[in-house]
């Protein structure tokens, strides 16, 4: 293992790296965005899943990163220098993501890096960044597998995922016995993001007397979700808690359930339904009704920074607030904490940025307050449960006492067919 070290870039090195990136874009698949100005840009590199299983999320993160850079550049950039983003496509592959960050840091010599999508890809990527002494702000690697590494350079402004379904499970457990489902199914992808939160919910619900009639983790390679969904339907479980990581996984189960005329009274998924217009388009507006999902952000969040983000997003990309994928807000938050650190330290020195983010300072982002512990978890993160309701509208339902929460639709309405 190579020793940890920080690389300091001279102005000429940044210029050379920038020229190399621009020259390579047409042949390597990299893309870059930058503002105008005479000062040399602050070059920030990121590997994202622009193709492959996580491509919808990767594209959403890219929009979040790009919107942040655009907004920052409108006000003069960082330290009076425009921000330039450089992207590499990891095709949703853990080996490729490690190669990409090595290339960004060691060859292209970017000033800073942002993280990829998913816990699966964050683990190898963060190790590379740590080896070179780079701060690693990221918004989608919230699984225990990331924090168990105990790396000093990881900082995630999004909520830790292990307990994100706890508010949902507590709500079900507290239902009157006549309303509480008696049986539940827990189909899960083999993923370090989905599994911890699904299993935490299952533990709470079993203690509340909800009997598990199906629990299976599908292999990462060539999972047969259609067969799995049919097996869940055959149990007649009154509740389904789906450990999913993306829109395609959630869609596969929903479509199979509809074909089987199986409609659980309560249906929650760990991810997929939080992805706005992408989810609605995939399953149909009527089939979203009643589905629940955890997250730390939605377009109606009563947060001035979030409201400004929503306005800027719609102005740049079009559509309506409900179309915005929560991944874009997570990516934008990564930019916000980075900007705060750069401004506070008056530098793009990764060692200083790491030290600042570990100083117990509380920062404000579109997702709410952020304060990091020693392993980079946001210990003051807001956790919400959302539900799709008639419209379709994506609304906050839990905690019920939180500002902006509306009553839960229970039981879930029937599928559109």
Regions found by a protein language model. Name each.
Residues 4, 31-34, 43, 56-61, ...:
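Beta-alpha junction/loop-to-helix N-cap segments that form part of ligand/metal-binding clefts
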Residues 109-215, 265-289:
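Extracytoplasmic ligand/sensor domains, especially the bilobed periplasmic-binding protein
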Residues 42, 63-84, 179, 206-210:
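Signal peptide-proximal N-terminal region
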Residues 316-328, 339-397:
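Segments of small-molecule ligand-sensing domains
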Residues 1-43, 74, 412-417:
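Short, low-complexity disordered leader/linker segments with a strong preference
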Residues 257-332, 400-404, 411-416:
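Extracellular/periplasmic periplasmic-binding protein-like sensory domains
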Residues 56, 60-67, 71, 96-103, ...:
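Extracytoplasmic/secreted proteins, especially bacterial periplasmic and envelope-associated proteins
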């Amino acid at each position: 293992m190579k020793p940890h070290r920080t690389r300091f870039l001279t102005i000429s090195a940044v210029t050379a790296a920038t020229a190399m990136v621009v020259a390579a874009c047409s042949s390597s698949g990299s893309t870059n965005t930058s503002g105008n100005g005479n000062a040399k840009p602050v070059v920030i590199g990121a590997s994202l899943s622009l193709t492959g299983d996580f491509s919808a999320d990767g594209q959403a993160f890219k929009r979040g990163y790009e919107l942040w850079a655009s907004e920052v550049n409108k006000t003069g950039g960082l330290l009076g220098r425009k921000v330039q983003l450089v992207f590499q496509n990891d095709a949703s592959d853990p080996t490729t993501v490690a190669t990409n960050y090595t290339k960004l840091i060691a060859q292209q010599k970017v000033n800073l890096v942002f993280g990829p999508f998913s816990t699966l890809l964050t683990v190898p990527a963060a190790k590379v960044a740590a080896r070179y002494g780079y701060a690693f702000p990221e918004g989608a690697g919230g699984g225990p597998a990331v924090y168990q590494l105990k790396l000093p350079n990881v900082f995630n402004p999004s909520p830790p995922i292990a307990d994100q379904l706890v508010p949902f499970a507590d709500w079900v457990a507290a239902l009157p016995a006549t309303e509480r489902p008696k049986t539940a199914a827990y189909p899960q992808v083999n993923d370090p993001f989905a599994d911890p939160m699904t299993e935490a919910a299952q533990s709470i619900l079993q203690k509340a007397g909800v009997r598990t009639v199906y629990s299976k983790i599908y292999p990462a390679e060539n999972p047969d979700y259609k067969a799995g969904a049919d097996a869940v339907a055959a149990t007649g479980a009154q509740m389904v808690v789906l450990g999913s990581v993306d829109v395609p996984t959630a869609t596969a189960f929903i479509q199979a359930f509809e074909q089987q005329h199986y409609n659980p009274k309560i249906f929650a998924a760990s991810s997929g339904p939080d992805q706005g217009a992408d989810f609605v388009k995939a399953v149909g507006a009527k089939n979203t009704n009643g589905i629940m999902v955890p997250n730390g952000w939605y377009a109606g969040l009563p947060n001035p920074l979030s409201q400004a983000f929503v306005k800027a997003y719609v102005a740049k990309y079009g559509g309506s607030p409900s179309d915005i994928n929560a991944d874009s807000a997570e990516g934008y938050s990564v930019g916000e904490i980075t900007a705060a650190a750069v401004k506070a330290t008056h530098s793009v020195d990764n060692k200083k940025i790491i030290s600042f983010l570990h100083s117990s300072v509380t920062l404000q982002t579109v997702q709410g307050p952020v304060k990091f512990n020693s392993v980079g978890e946001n210990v003051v993160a807001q956790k919400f449960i959302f539900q799709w309701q008639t419209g379709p509208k994506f609304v906050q339902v839990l905690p019920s006492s939180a500002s902006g929460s509306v009553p839960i639709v229970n039981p879930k309405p029937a599928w559109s067919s």
